[in-house]
Amino acid sequence: MSTKRYKIEYAKSSREDMKRTKKYILNTFKYREYGENFTKIMRQAADSLKVLPTGFDKIGLLYRGYDIYIKPYRTYLLFYIVNSETNTVIMLRVLKDGTDWEHIIRTWLKHEK
Protein backbone atom coordinates (compact mmCIF):
# COMPACT_ATOMS: atom_id res chain seq x y z
CA MET A 1 0.00 0.00 0.00
CA SER A 2 1.53 3.33 -1.04
CA THR A 3 1.23 6.43 1.07
CA LYS A 4 -0.71 9.32 -0.44
CA ARG A 5 1.52 12.34 -0.99
CA TYR A 6 0.27 15.91 -1.13
CA LYS A 7 1.60 18.86 -3.07
CA ILE A 8 2.30 22.00 -1.02
CA GLU A 9 1.12 25.37 -2.35
CA TYR A 10 1.43 28.78 -0.74
CA ALA A 11 -1.36 31.35 -0.75
CA LYS A 12 -0.28 34.95 -1.24
CA SER A 13 -1.07 35.60 2.43
CA SER A 14 1.39 32.95 3.67
CA ARG A 15 4.13 34.24 1.35
CA GLU A 16 3.52 37.76 2.69
CA ASP A 17 3.67 36.48 6.29
CA MET A 18 7.03 34.82 5.67
CA LYS A 19 8.40 37.87 3.87
CA ARG A 20 7.25 40.20 6.67
CA THR A 21 8.76 37.97 9.38
CA LYS A 22 12.05 37.65 7.52
CA LYS A 23 12.22 41.45 7.19
CA TYR A 24 11.41 41.84 10.90
CA ILE A 25 14.21 39.43 11.88
CA LEU A 26 16.72 41.23 9.68
CA ASN A 27 15.74 44.74 10.81
CA THR A 28 15.21 44.07 14.51
CA PHE A 29 17.80 41.47 15.41
CA LYS A 30 20.30 42.04 12.62
CA TYR A 31 20.59 38.23 12.52
CA ARG A 32 21.24 37.80 8.82
CA GLU A 33 21.75 34.03 8.77
CA TYR A 34 18.45 33.28 10.53
CA GLY A 35 16.61 35.92 8.55
CA GLU A 36 17.88 34.57 5.26
CA ASN A 37 17.03 31.00 6.26
CA PHE A 38 13.60 31.77 7.74
CA THR A 39 11.63 31.09 4.57
CA LYS A 40 13.60 27.92 3.93
CA ILE A 41 12.91 26.68 7.47
CA MET A 42 9.17 27.39 7.19
CA ARG A 43 9.01 25.66 3.80
CA GLN A 44 10.71 22.61 5.30
CA ALA A 45 8.09 22.59 8.05
CA ALA A 46 5.34 22.80 5.43
CA ASP A 47 6.97 20.00 3.42
CA SER A 48 6.42 17.67 6.36
CA LEU A 49 2.70 17.95 5.55
CA LYS A 50 3.16 16.09 2.26
CA VAL A 51 2.24 12.93 4.16
CA LEU A 52 -0.78 12.86 6.50
CA PRO A 53 -1.59 16.59 6.60
CA THR A 54 -4.86 15.87 8.40
CA GLY A 55 -2.91 14.57 11.40
CA PHE A 56 -2.96 18.00 13.03
CA ASP A 57 -5.80 19.81 14.79
CA LYS A 58 -8.55 21.74 13.04
CA ILE A 59 -9.13 25.22 14.43
CA GLY A 60 -12.91 25.23 13.97
CA LEU A 61 -12.92 27.75 11.11
CA LEU A 62 -13.44 27.26 7.39
CA TYR A 63 -11.74 28.78 4.37
CA ARG A 64 -13.75 28.44 1.15
CA GLY A 65 -15.54 25.43 2.62
CA TYR A 66 -12.37 23.66 3.82
CA ASP A 67 -11.39 23.08 7.44
CA ILE A 68 -8.38 25.10 8.53
CA TYR A 69 -5.66 23.09 10.27
CA ILE A 70 -2.89 24.30 12.56
CA LYS A 71 0.64 22.92 12.71
CA PRO A 72 2.92 24.25 15.44
CA TYR A 73 6.56 24.45 14.41
CA ARG A 74 9.21 25.85 16.74
CA THR A 75 7.83 29.26 17.71
CA TYR A 76 5.50 29.57 14.72
CA LEU A 77 2.05 28.37 13.74
CA LEU A 78 1.28 27.22 10.22
CA PHE A 79 -2.36 27.44 9.09
CA TYR A 80 -3.45 25.45 6.06
CA ILE A 81 -6.26 23.65 4.27
CA VAL A 82 -6.27 20.23 2.65
CA ASN A 83 -7.90 19.52 -0.70
CA SER A 84 -8.13 15.72 -0.86
CA GLU A 85 -9.53 15.79 -4.41
CA THR A 86 -6.39 17.42 -5.82
CA ASN A 87 -4.01 16.06 -3.14
CA THR A 88 -2.97 19.61 -2.29
CA VAL A 89 -2.12 21.36 0.97
CA ILE A 90 -2.51 25.12 0.72
CA MET A 91 -0.58 27.11 3.29
CA LEU A 92 -2.75 30.06 4.32
CA ARG A 93 -0.87 31.86 7.08
CA VAL A 94 2.40 31.63 9.01
CA LEU A 95 2.12 33.40 12.36
CA LYS A 96 4.29 33.74 15.45
CA ASP A 97 2.98 31.78 18.41
CA GLY A 98 1.89 33.95 21.31
CA THR A 99 -0.11 36.19 18.99
CA ASP A 100 -3.88 36.37 19.10
CA TRP A 101 -3.95 34.07 16.09
CA GLU A 102 -7.68 33.40 16.31
CA HIS A 103 -8.46 37.11 15.99
CA ILE A 104 -5.92 37.46 13.16
CA ILE A 105 -7.39 34.50 11.25
CA ARG A 106 -11.01 35.62 11.78
CA THR A 107 -10.19 39.16 10.59
CA TRP A 108 -8.27 37.81 7.60
CA LEU A 109 -11.17 35.50 6.68
CA LYS A 110 -13.60 38.45 6.69
CA HIS A 111 -11.39 40.27 4.18
CA GLU A 112 -10.92 37.18 2.01
CA LYS A 113 -14.61 36.85 1.16
Label for each model-derived stretch:
Residues 22, 43-46, 95:
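Conserved protein kinase catalytic domain
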Residues 1-41:
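Arg/Lys-rich, positively charged N-terminal/basic patches that mediate binding to nucleic acids
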Residues 73-77, 81-113:
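Enriched for short, Lys/Arg-rich terminal
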Residues 44, 48-88:
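Basic/aromatic recognition patch in beta-strand/loop cores that engages polyanionic ligands
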